[in-house]
């Protein structure tokens, strides 16, 4: 049921963005883009994340509405213009995937560093000794 709720939330957000954003931006320019962001993304975020159509577990990768909106946009063009649109978008999808992997690696490194610093603050150090000196002592098992 969780998958079905998420799929419904992604579909609603994707269809509304793909049908409303472009006309607003074309008719009202940059203001239309900001207006679309406000009147589409705000309520869709509320429905999907606050109400809970899209559930993100604490120990799982975070999947946001952008994935559903992106897939909806790609598939809309495939249905309207043919499979060539999917083929022409593959390089962009590949670069997005590479960027996502790199972002995940950087985020994991940052999270690991933050956890290490948090643990260091929790442990009591000897007066006059900095964290590096204490780590060196612990590695050499002198303590």
UniProtKB/Swiss-Prot annotation:
Q: Which cysteines are joined by disulfide bonds?
A: none
- The source's domain of life comes to Bacteria
Instruction: State any GO BP term from the record.
Output: glycerol metabolic process
The entry's function note states:
Could be involved in the glycerol uptake either via facilitated diffusion or active transport.
Keyword terms of this UniProt record: Glycerol metabolism, Membrane, Transmembrane, Transmembrane helix, Transport
Disordered, as annotated region: 118-143
Inducing or repressing factors: Repressed by GolR.
Membrane protein topology class:
Multi-pass membrane protein
Cross-referenced Pfam families:
DUF6905
Q: What is the lineage of its organism?
A: Bacteria, Bacillati, Bacillota, Bacilli, Bacillales
Q: One Gene Ontology cellular component annotation?
A: membrane
Keyword Transmembrane helix annotated:
yes
- Mind telling me what this protein is named? Putative glycerol transporter Lin0368
Source organism: Listeria innocua serovar 6a (strain ATCC BAA-680 / CLIP 11262)
UniProt main location, coarse: membrane
Kindly list the residue ranges recorded as spanning the membrane: 6-26, 27-47, 60-80, 90-110
Q: Does the keyword Coiled coil apply?
A: no
User: Which compartments does it reside in?
Assistant: Membrane
């Amino acid at each position: 049921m969780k998958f079905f709720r998420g799929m419904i939330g992604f579909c609603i957000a994707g269809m509304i963005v793909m049908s409303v954003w472009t006309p607003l931006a074309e008719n009202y320019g940059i203001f239309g883009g900001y207006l679309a962001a406000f009147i589409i993304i705000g309520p869709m975020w509320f429905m999907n994340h606050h109400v809970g159509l899209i559930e993100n577990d604490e120990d799982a990768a975070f999947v946001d509405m952008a994935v559903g909106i992106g897939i909806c946009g790609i598939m809309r063009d495939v249905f309207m213009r043919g499979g060539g649109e999917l083929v022409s978008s593959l390089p962009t999808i590949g670069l997005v995937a590479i960027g996502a992997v790199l972002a995940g690696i950087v985020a994991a490194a940052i999270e690991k560093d933050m956890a290490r610093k948090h643990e260091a603050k929790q442990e009591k150090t000897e007066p006059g000794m900095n964290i590096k000196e204490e780590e060196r002592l612990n590695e050499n098992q002198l303590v």
